[in-house]
Curated annotation (Swiss-Prot):
Enzyme class: transferase
Protein name: Nucleoside diphosphate kinase
Major location (coarse): cytoplasm
InterPro entries xrefs: NDK-like_dom, NDK-like_dom_sf, Nucleoside_diP_kinase, Nucleoside_diP_kinase_AS
Organism the protein comes from: Citrifermentans bemidjiense (strain ATCC BAA-1014 / DSM 16622 / JCM 12645 / Bem)
């Protein structure tokens, strides 16, 4: 079994679509092995998204991710990383395929509802950024 990291972003929490996202996750065959609602500080968001530090959108991304609560998740299933990327859909909801979370619930490129690890290396950094081993069941 493979694990991946996911975030339900502040825009989705604000719009009260968390339950819809969780339902789509479970319908997609994922087991939720870790979940917590947190509010990131700007510093925590900067640490989490450090790989984008030199990108022009870094400041806006960190401000967005720290504007309100998020739901941090660890998901488990065979091929979890690729399957979660597929269920999320394209970054821009306008380009996402029908049946994906971003097509169904995303608003814009920034307010696109969810984040997910893009590789095993990313997941191995992102999961322990939010969860310790005792919190994963």
């Amino acid at each position: 079994m493979e694990r991946t990291f996911a975030i339900i972003k502040p825009d989705a929490v604000e719009r009260n679509v968390t339950g819809k996202v969780l339902a789509m996750i479970e319908e997609g065959g994922f087991k939720i092995v870790g979940m917590k609602k947190i509010r990131l500080s700007k510093c925590q968001a900067e640490g989490f998204y450090y790989v984008h530090k030199e990108r022009p959108f870094f400041g806006d991304l960190c401000a967005f991710m720290s504007r309100g609560p998020v739901i941090a998740l660890v998901l488990e299933k065979e091929n979890a990383i690729a399957d979660w990327r597929g269920l999320m859909g394209a970054t821009n909801p306008a380009n996402a395929e029908a049946g994906t979370i971003r097509k169904a619930l995303g608003v814009s490129i920034e307010e696109n509802t969810v984040h997910g690890s893009d590789s095993p290396e990313s997941a191995s950094y992102e999961i322990p950024y939010f969860f310790n081993q005792l919190e994963l069941v």
